[in-house]
Amino acid sequence: MDIEMIEVILLAIALAMDAFAVSIGLGAKSQKQSSAYVLRLAVYAALYFGIAQGVMPLIGYLLGAVLLGWLATAAPWLGGGILILLGAKMLYEAFNGEIEAVLEDSFDRNMQEKINHRMMFTLAIATSIDAMAAGFTLNLLALNAWLACSIIAIVTAGFGFFGIYLGKSSGTWLEDKAEILGGLVLIAIGIKVMFIR
């Protein structure tokens, strides 16, 4: 496996941590629900989070391709800075319980035996905004954007699916740890983009 593929996989795992943490929270909130409901929730989490996390970096990549020509000399600093800021934001959210607050607000209104697609769509978009910003750096990492976005989507879908079951069985104590891991990986990739060419 070459270094570029390792970077794509690490980026995919880091970007999936928001969706993973939200999925753990959704699973934890579903502990009293039927097995059929939890399976449907896991499938929808995989679909919503996977598609959003795959499309948003592609949008960021396309925007980045346009901006890269204008900002060629500053691009590594800008791209690395974006990843470092995203990582720092994930760490901040992990230590301040912001994901739990979003889930509490959503679930207080929607706890029932049917999937609330509006809530799932909103959570998918909210967790994938960071992925759009990270997509800008795909140009700087010299990665195949289509392959990278496909891997990001598949990894996120897997984390979304299994996060539901992990949350159902273990509760919410893993949410913050997933955010911390994702934040640290994004910071490391950002430093690499800035200083190692």
From Swiss-Prot:
Transmembrane stretches, start-end? 8-28, 43-63, 66-86, 123-143, 146-166, 176-196
Q: How does it sit in the membrane?
A: Multi-pass membrane protein
Q: Which GO terms describe its cellular component?
A: plasma membrane
Task: Identify the main location.
Answer: membrane
Q: Does the keyword Nucleotide-binding apply?
A: no
Q: Which family does it belong to?
A: Belongs to the MntP (TC 9.B.29) family.
Show the HAMAP family listed in the entry: MntP_pump
UniProt xrefs under PANTHER family: MANGANESE EFFLUX PUMP MNTP-RELATED
Q: What is this protein called?
A: Putative manganese efflux pump MntP 1
This chain's source organism reads: Psychrobacter cryohalolentis (strain ATCC BAA-1226 / DSM 17306 / VKM B-2378 / K5)
